[in-house]
Regions:
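Outer-membrane beta-barrel translocator domains and adjoining extracellular loop/strand segments
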Residues: 251-256, 297-308, 354-366, 412-421, ...
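Structural signature of Gram-negative outer-membrane beta-barrels, strongest in the C-terminal barrel
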Residues: 404-409, 434-440, 446-466, 478-613, ...
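Membrane-proximal, glycine/serine-rich, low-complexity loop/turn segments characteristic
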Residues: 20, 64, 99, 116, ...
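A short, solvent-exposed loop/turn motif at the edges and junctions
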Residues: 47-52, 74, 78-90
C-alpha cells in the first residue's frame, strides 16, 4: 500500500529553471569616405517580424555603441545619422552567443534629411541553451535548510551512489566546481563533500551534460557548478538565517543486538549569514555557515552467504557528532572602466567523532562469533585562495582574464579499533595524515565576432598529496602488515584550448579542441609488500567537442553534441591503506589505476510555449578502461572473514539513454514539472588480477540492464499566501559491477511563508517522509553472495527562518 501511495504522489511532484540571459550588441560607425568616426549617431533595434522598435542607443564620441539587455530573437538593426543615408543589418540572437560585435559600419553621406529615432524599451527573456540547466535554490522549498546534496536530489537526471556521490545519467564521474573553479573542498575530478556543504548561501546550481573545450576534460558524466550568492546593489545588503532539524526519525530495519545501536532523532543546528557591501568601485562579500549536529551518514547492514554454507550478518552504523564551519568571502575592485580585480578565499574546517559497535553473528548457529567496536576522530580542513584579473577591451565582451589559485586540503584521521573473537582480543590504532596542495594558473581570452565569438585559453595545474600512515598495532593485530608508513602522489597538468561559436538565423555551431599533457607519479614506501614498484607515467591527449543546433523556430530547436572526456583516478582511488570501519569489508585503493576515456554523443530537442517547455534527449556514451570497485574474498588468513573492495580497471562499458523534462504552469499559483531518465548500462565481460593482499584472479561477467528514474514536483499556494512544494523521486533497479542496486523512492514536502513585510521567511521541510530512500545492493562474488542495505539518515525534518536586509 505504501508503495502505491508513493507511486501516486510521484505524479504530483523536480522543478527546474533555465537561466535567463540577454545579449549585448556592439559596433562602431564610420564615414565611408573620410573614415572618420561618427559620434552621436542613432542605432535602433527593431523586431524582424513587425519592425517595431525594441531598444536602441546613441554612439559615443568615438562612434562606438553598446546596447545591453536585448531579448533573444531576430531583429533588424538600423544605423542613422543626420546627413548620411541610413543602413540596416539583420541580427539573430538565439542564445548560444551573448555578445555580438557588428564591427565596422560605414554610412554614406547623403543630402536627404533623416528622421531621428527615439530609443526606448527593455524586456526579459529566457535562455534556450540546450546544454546547460540552471536551478535556482530560492524556490527549492522541500529541501530548504539542507545540504547541496539534498538540494540536488530533485534535479533531473541526478542520483546518488553508495558513497554519497552525485550520479548524472548513471555515472558518478562528475566534476564539481564552486563559482566556476575546482577546489579541494569538492575534489579535482573525484567529487566529494557535497553532503556537508549547506545550501543556505548557494544562489543556483548549474548542470552541464556536454561541457565545451573551455572546461577541464575530466568528468565524462558532466559538470556541476555551485554558484554562491553575490549581490550587486549599492550599500549593505544580505541575509541571516537559522535552521534547526531532527534526522533519522525512524528505523527502516531494527538494529542488531549491541549496546550502542545507531543514532536516531539526531539534532541539527545551522546558522548562516550572507553579507554584501558595495561602495563606488569596491564590492565586499562574505558568506558563512556553521553546522552543529548528530548524524548517521552510514548505517550498513550486511548479510554474507558463503559457498561452504556459512551465513554471517552484521551492522556498521556510523554514529557521528560533528561541528563544521565554512567561510567564503572576497573583494571585487573596479580599477577603472576596463580593468577589474577580485581576491577571494574559502576556509572550511570540520571535526567529527564517529563511533560504532559491530556484532558479527552466525545465522546458522545463532551465535555471535565476533564483536568489534571502533572510534574515529577526524579533522578535515580546506583552504582556497584565488586572485582573478580581468581586462575589458573597448569592444563589449572582448576580454582577457587570468586566475591564480591555491588550494589545500588536509585530512587527519585516527581509528581506535577494539576486536574480540575466538582467535584474538586486542586493540589497534591507525592514523592517516594527508595534505593536498594544488596550484593552478589559467588565462582566458574572449573575442566577440559579428555572429559568434572565439575563445582561447591555457592552464597549468600542479598537485601534490603526500600521505603519512602510522600504525600502533596490538597483539594479534588485524591490520595488514608491511604497508609502509608513507606515500607521495603528484600530478602536473598542462592544457590549452580553442573554442569557436557561430550563430546564424537557422542554425548555430560551437566547436572546440582541448589539448592536455599530464605527468603522474606515485611513490610508495619500499617496505610495502603488496605493490613493490613505484608508478610513473605521462600522456598527451586531444579532447574535441562540437555542438550543432538547428532552429525550426525560436521556440523549437534540435541540437546534436559530441565530446571526448577523461576521468583520472585521484589519490583516494589510489590509496593503499585500507579503511577499517568494517573489518570484514575493507575498502582499499589501487596505486596502478589508469585513466578512463569516454566518447559521448547526444541529440536533444527543446520546445517552449508561453506557460511551459518540453526538453528531450537521446544520449550514448562509450567508456574505455573504466575503473570501479571489485568485491573479492581475502582467504590469506583462515582466522578472519574478509571481503576486499578494491578499485580496478575493468575494460569497456557503454551507457545509452533517454531523458525528458517537462514544465507547465497550470495556473498562476500551481506549477507542475517532471523528469524521466531511462538508460541501459552495459558492462563488458572482463578478467583481471588483484594484487592486494595476495595476487588472485577475478572475473567480471557481462552485465546488461535497463534502469530508470522519475521525478515530479508540484508547486502551489495555500491559504494565507503559504508557498508549498511536494516532490516525489523514484529510482528503479539497476545493474552495478557484480550485482544489482534495488529500487528506492522518496517523498519530500516543504512550506514557506513570507514574514516581516516580505523581509523575512520561515520554512518547514520534511525529506523522505516514508523513510524509503536507503540504498540496497546484492552482490555475487567468487565464492560468496552478499546483500548490503545502507539505511543512512535520509528522513529529516527542518524548520528555518531567514531575515533579509
Amino acid at each position: 500500500m505504501r508503495n502505491t501511495i508513493i507511486f501516486l504522489l510521484l505524479f504530483f511532484t523536480a522543478h527546474y529553471f533555465y537561466a535567463q540571459d540577454n545579449v549585448i550588441v556592439t559596433g562602431q560607425l564610420f564615414d565611408s569616405e573620410t573614415q572618420e568616426t561618427l559620434p552621436f549617431a542613432n542605432v535602433s533595434i527593431n523586431s524582424f517580424a513587425d519592425n517595431v522598435l525594441v531598444t536602441g542607443a546613441i554612439t559615443d564620441i568615438d562612434g562606438r555603441f553598446e546596447i545591453q539587455e536585448i531579448p533573444l530573437g531576430k531583429y533588424k538593426v538600423y544605423f542613422s545619422f543626420i546627413g548620411y543615408a541610413s543602413t540596416q543589418q539583420n541580427l539573430v540572437a538565439g542564445g548560444l552567443n551573448t555578445i555580438f560585435d557588428l564591427g565596422k559600419i560605414e554610412l554614406k553621406p547623403s543630402t536627404e534629411a533623416l528622421m531621428e529615432v527615439q530609443v526606448t524599451g527593455k524586456q526579459a527573456t529566457t535562455n534556450s541553451d540546450l546544454n546547460k540547466k540552471t536551478f535556482s535554490l530560492e524556490d527549492n522549498i522541500a529541501q530548504s535548510g539542507g545540504s547541496v546534496l539534498d538540494a540536488m536530489k530533485t534535479m533531473p537526471g541526478v542520483a546518488f551512489d553508495q558513497e554519497g556521490k552525485v550520479v548524472l545519467r548513471g555515472s558518478d564521474k562528475v566534476v564539481v566546481l564552486i563559482d566556476g573553479k575546482q577546489s579541494s573542498l569538492t575534489g579535482f575530478g573525484n567529487q566529494k563533500g557535497l553532503g556537508n556543504i549547506p545550501a543556505s548561501n548557494i544562489e543556483k546550481i548549474e548542470i552541464i551534460n556536454n561541457p565545451s573545450a573551455k572546461y577541464d576534460a575530466n568528468g565524462f558524466a558532466g559538470v556541476v557548478n555551485i554558484i554562491y550568492k553575490k549581490e550587486k546593489q549599492t550599500g549593505l545588503n544580505g541575509d541571516i538565517g537559522l535552521s534547526f532539524g531532527l534526522g533519522a526519525l525512524g528505523k527502516s530495519k531494527p538494529d542488531t543486538n549491541t549496546d550502542l545501536g545507531s543514532f536516531s532523532v539526531n539534532p541539527k543546528l545551522i546558522p548562516s549569514i550572507n553579507l554584501n557591501y558595495k561602495k563606488d568601485k569596491v564590492n565586499y562579500f562574505l558568506q558563512s555557515e556553521f553546522i552543529l549536529q548528530e548524524a548517521l551518514p552510514n548505517n550498513e547492514f550486511t548479510t554474507r552467504n558463503y559457498e561452504d554454507g556459512r551465513n554471517i550478518i552484521s551492522q556498521v552504523p556510523e554514529n557521528r557528532k560533528q561541528f563544521r564551519s565554512i567561510i567564503n568571502g572576497g573583494i571585487d575592485f573596479e580599477l577603472d572602466n576596463k580593468n577589474s580585480f577580485t581576491i577571494s578565499g574559502l576556509y572550511d574546517r570540520e571535526k567529527h567523532i564517529d563511533t560504532a559497535q559491530v556484532a558479527f553473528t552466525d545465522l546458522n548457529k545463532n551465535t555471535r562469533n565476533r564483536f568489534y567496536n571502533w572510534r574515529e576522530e577526524e579533522v578535515t580542513r580546506y583552504i582556497n585562495a584565488s586572485a582573478n584579473y580581468r581586462h575589458q577591451f573597448e569592444q563589449a565582451g572582448h576580454t582577457l582574464s587570468a586566475i591564480v589559485q591555491y588550494t589545500q586540503g588536509l585530512e587527519d584521521e585516527t581509528y581506535s579499533l577494539n576486536d574480540s573473537s575466538a582467535v584474538r582480543v586486542g586493540r589497534d590504532k591507525t592514523n592517516i595524515l594527508a595534505i593536498e596542495n594544488t596550484t593552478s594558473i589559467s588565462t582566458d581570452y574572449v573575442r566577440p565576432l559579428k555572429s559568434g565569438r572565439i575563445e582561447l585559453g591555457a592552464k597549468l595545474r600542479i598537485r601534490r598529496l603526500p600521505v603519512e600512515y602510522t600504525i600502533t598495532p596490538g597483539e594479534q593485530s588485524i591490520i595488514y602488515p608491511d604497508l609502509g608508513t608513507f606515500s607521495d602522489w603528484g600530478e602536473n597538468l598542462f592544457a590549452g584550448y580553442v573554442n569557436y561559436l557561430m550563430e546564424k538565423e537557422d542554425y548555430d555551431i560551437e566547436a572546440g579542441l582541448r589539448a592536455e599533457q599530464t605527468d603522474v607519479f606515485y611513490d610508495l614506501d619500499p617496505v610495502n609488500a603488496y605493490y613493490p614498484n613505484n608508478d610513473k607515467y605521462n600522456y598527451f591527449e586531444l579532447f574535441p567537442s562540437i555542438r550543432y543546433t538547428y532552429k525550426l523556430k525560436d521556440n523549437n530547436r534540435f541540437s546534436a553534441f559530441y565530446n571526448r572526456r577523461i576521468d583520472r583516478p585521484g589519490e583516494p582511488e589510489l590509496r593503499i591503506y585500507p579503511k577499517y570501519d568494517d573489518p570484514e569489508l575493507l575498502k582499499v585503493g589501487n596505486p596502478y589505476l589508469r585513466p578512463q576515456f569516454t566518447d559521448a554523443f547526444e541529440v536533444a530537442h527543446k520546445y517552449s510555449w508561453t506557460t511551459g517547455s518540453l526538453f528531450s534527449a537521446i544520449y550514448h556514451r562509450m567508456t574505455k578502461d573504466q575503473y570501479m570497485r571489485i568485491f573479492s574474498i581475502d582467504d590469506s588468513n583462515p582466522d578472519y572473514e574478509i571481503v576486499n573492495k578494491i578499485y580496478q580497471n575493468t575494460g569497456d562499458a557503454t551507457n545509452t539513454g533517454v531523458e525528458f523534462l517537462v514544465s507547465q504552469d497550470i495556473t498562476n499559483t500551481f506549477k507542475l514539472s517532471a523528469s524521466f531518465n531511462g538508460y541501459e548500462n552495459v558492462i563488458k565481460e572482463f578478467e583481471g588480477t588483484l594484487l592486494f593482499p595476495v595476487e588472485r584472479q577475478f572475473t567480471l561477467a557481462e552485465s546488461n540492464d535497463i534502469a530508470w528514474d522519475a521525478k515530479i514536483t508540484s508547486e502551489f499556494v495555500l491559504p494565507w499566501e503559504i508557498a508549498a512544494q511536494l516532490t516525489g523521486v523514484y529510482f528503479s533497479n539497476k545493474n552495478i559491477p557484480q550485482g544489482d542496486q534495488l529500487a528506492r523512492s522518496s517523498i519530500d514536502f516543504g512550506l514557506k511563508k513570507n514574514i516581516w513585510d516580505k523581509n523575512g521567511e520561515i520554512t518547514i521541510a520534511a525529506t523522505d517522509v516514508f523513510n524509503t530512500f536507503g540504498i540496497r545492493q546484492e552482490i555475487v562474488g567468487n565464492g560468496f553472495t552478499s546483500r548490503y542495505e545502507n539505511y543512512f539518515e535520509t528522513q529529516v525534518i527542518r524548520v528555518g527562518v531567514k531575515y533579509k536586509f
